[in-house]
């Protein structure tokens, strides 16, 4: 299972088989980034949990089934160890534009910055992607990337969709993904379980 946009890969039993964490010094710098905390919240996925700077009940409802729940922390005092990703969530995509510009200017040469959704901007270690993680996952297999198919709906799927033998874009995908991968076939909507119906 590939998680955190490729920063972690686990087998079916949950054992970690690949890891690519953000350097701690970069994480601590990311905590200091200026942003409007009335419009944006900062989160981290780390080896010891999911952390956030403020309580956001609407996020909690998406994690009822898994039991994976955030812990509210003061990031001025929080550690930066074992960080899969630092991510910023806003209600309005426009509120992330200035932050994205800042991140790309100050961290673009040493991190991977990508949207996983229209309102979620994520920062991982340099060269982290689902495509890279998939290539690591296949290292000891008798088949490669070109023997795989993949489905995606976000900008964080670009490398994976481009590197596999056949990539499909969901109908409800981020328009920026469709623009980046115009050559890929578009199929139905996630809500219609199109992947299961098609394959």
Functional labels for PLM-detected ranges:
Residues 163, 171-199:
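Asp-based, Mg2+/Mn2+-dependent phosphohydrolase catalytic module
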Residues 1-25:
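Alpha-helical substrate-recognition element adjacent to the catalytic core
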Residues 4, 89, 170, 187:
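Conserved residues at the C-terminal ends of beta-strands
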Residues 6-8, 154-156, 190:
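Gly/Ser/Thr-rich beta-alpha loop segments that engage phosphate groups in nucleotides
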Residues 5-6, 151-153, 166, 170:
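Glycine-rich beta-strand-to-loop/alpha-helix junction loops that act as flexible
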Residues 29, 33, 37-151, 155-160, ...:
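Conserved acidic, metal-coordinating active-site core of Asp-based
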């Amino acid at each position: 299972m590939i998680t955190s946009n490729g920063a972690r890969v686990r087998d079916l039993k949950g054992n970690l088989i690949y890891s690519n964490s953000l350097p701690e010094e970069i994480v601590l710098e990311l905590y200091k980034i200026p942003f409007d905390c009335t419009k944006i919240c900062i989160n981290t996925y780390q080896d010891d949990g999911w952390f956030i700077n403020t309580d956001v009940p609407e996020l909690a409802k998406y994690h009822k089934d898994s039991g994976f729940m955030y812990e509210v922390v003061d990031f001025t005092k929080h550690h930066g160890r074992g960080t899969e990703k630092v991510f910023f969530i806003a209600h309005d995509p426009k509120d992330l534009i200035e932050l994205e510009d800042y991140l790309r200017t100050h961290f673009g040469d040493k991190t991977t910055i990508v949207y996983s959704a229209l309102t979620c901007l994520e920062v991982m270690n340099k060269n982290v992607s689902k495509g890279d993680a998939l290539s690591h996952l296949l290292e000891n297999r008798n088949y490669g990337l070109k023997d795989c198919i993949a489905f995606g709906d976000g900008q964080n799927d670009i490398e994976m969709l481009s590197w596999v033998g056949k990539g499909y874009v969901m109908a409800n995908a981020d328009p920026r993904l469709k623009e980046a991968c115009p050559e890929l076939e578009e199929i139905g909507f996630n809500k219609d379980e199109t992947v299961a119906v098609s394959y």
